[in-house]
Amino acid sequence: MFLIITRDTMFFTAMKNILSKGNVVHIQNEEEIDVMLHQNAFVIIDTLMNNVFHSNFLTQIERLKPVHVIIFSPFNIKRCLGKVPVTFVPRTIAIIDFVALINGSYCSVPEADVSLSRKQHQVLSCIANQMTTEDILEKLKISLKTFYCHKHNIMMILNLKRINELVRHQHINYLV
C-alpha cells in the first residue's frame, strides 16, 4: 500500500499513474490516516506548500511504522522520523530513478540542497511563518541565546545576509 501525502492533485495523479501496481491512497490531512488500516505502508510525502514536519501529522506517520518514507523536499532533515528509513528527493528526480527507489534498487538520487537538524528546520519554519521571536521561544521551549544560535547557523547554511531575505529564498514554499 502506498500513502501519498500531498495537497497537489496533479502530483497525486502522477504518483498514482507511476505506482499503478499497488493500492494508492491520497491523504490530505491527518484525520484521513487510519493507524490500523495503513500500518506498514510505503509513505510518499510532498512538502511543497505542505510542511507536515513538527506537527501531529508526522507523529501519526511515525505510528504507522512505515516500511519506507520518501519525502519530496529540498531539505534533508536529520532523524526527522526517528528510526524510520527516510529518503529525501527533489521534485526534479527522473521518473526512472524514482521507480528504482520505490523498487529498492540502487539509483543515484541527488542530494538535498540543504541539510538541517530537526530543531533548525523547526526554527526556520517558524520564521518563515512569520512568528515573533517570543512566540518561537515559547513554542519550541528554547532560550533566546539558543534561538539566535540556530538563526545564525540557518543564515549561514542558506547564504542569507539578513533573515528578511528568506522571503525571496527559492525554497520558501516548502516551509509554509
Curated annotation (Swiss-Prot):
GO MF annotation list: DNA binding
Induction: By acidic conditions. Could be induced by EvgA via the induction of YdeO.
Keywords: DNA-binding, Transcription, Transcription regulation
The keyword Cell cycle belongs to this UniProt entry's keyword annotation: no
Superkingdom assignment: Bacteria
One BP term from GO: regulation of DNA-templated transcription
Chain residues forming the annotated DNA-binding region: 133-152
Signal peptide feature range: none
Domain HTH luxR-type: 109-174
Transcription is among the record's keywords: yes
Function: May act as a transcriptional regulator of dctA.
Protein name: HTH-type transcriptional regulator DctR
